[in-house]
Amino acid sequence: MSHTAEIPMVPGSESPLELKPLKAVDPKTVYHRRAQRLLSLAKDSPLADYFELCRRVVAIQARLAAEADFGQLLAWGKDEAIPLSHLGSEADSYWQGLLQQLLSDLLPQVDEDMARVLRLLMQQSPEQLTSWGSALRQGHMSEVPARFSLFIWAAMGVYWSHWAPMVIKRIDQRKVVQQNLCPICGCHPVASVIVDQPRAGLRYLHCSLCESEWHYIRAHCTSCGQDKGTTLWSFDDAKAQVRIESCDECHGYTKMLFVEKSPLMDVAADDLATLMLDSELNAKGFGATTVNPLLLAHETEQ
């Protein structure tokens, strides 16, 4: 349950072919489809056990997205470039409440080793959780114990993804400029997605936290913005559904998921399922400039 009546609506164009700088998604749908995709991909994965853990976490996210009480949208910077980047301490209280619900639901579904991890996380102080949450959102993954990151991010994701669509409807998208971080919450993308709506071949970056998508011109590095020295890699098939775009300028890379060719793909699940592509690019001296909510690698591990 939530309240948004106090936020004025900004009218937009009605053209179905208009290029939308921002695309809102329904978090319930995203989490439900992600859980299904994880279940499907686990069948042929050497990481089947981890895929199953992630599936259970995402399934709980879907339930929380549908049933949790999110209160009222807190003061947000509608005049700021990134409106949901600084929500204050009340937001911490809400996502930490979601975290406790997530851990309680997950506890009976895991083995004893993982249960000990969950119980330890449940015992952390609000101040500690606030510090860890802030570090993760700022990309400082190494400041948070790796065994806790998946669950903290999952809880924050439920909260931020709930409010993002409502904020997107209420900002002037004409002021949104191309950028490498999410224009709504300021977090890194998971990967690029190539879509067929409103026009075929458009690229959007998909946010790792609030699940929003924002347009980004193809053949430009999604990290440094350079339009020279980018290479599109495809290791087995030139028309593969997952490819990688690397940049010779900053030596970063991002995956490109051609969801127009395979609508069942999910940006987080399919990124996780193609870690061998990351290994290939790492061996060539490139590093990921993205964040996967299901695999929050420490900076030194990227």
From Swiss-Prot:
Give a GO cellular-component term. cytosol
The superkingdom listed in its UniProt entry is Bacteria
> Example GO molecular function term?
ferric iron binding
Keyword annotations for this protein, in alphabetical order, are: Cytoplasm
Q: Which residues form the signal peptide?
A: none
Q: Which Pfam families match?
A: FdhE_C, FdhE_central, FdhE_N
InterPro entries (UniProt xref): FdhE-like_sf, FdhE_C, FdhE_central, FdhE_N, Formate_DH_accessory
Q: Which residues lie in coiled coils? A: none
Its function?
Answer: Necessary for formate dehydrogenase activity.
> What does the UniProt entry say about where the protein is found?
Cytoplasm
Q: Which organism is it from?
A: Shewanella sp. (strain MR-4)
Can the keyword Mitochondrion be found in this entry's annotation? Answer: no
The entry sums up its family as follows: Belongs to the FdhE family.
Q: What is the lineage of its organism?
A: Bacteria, Pseudomonadati, Pseudomonadota, Gammaproteobacteria, Alteromonadales
Gene Ontology biological process terms from the UniProt entry: protein maturation
Is Calcium among the key words of this record? Answer: no
Protein name from the UniProt record: Protein FdhE homolog
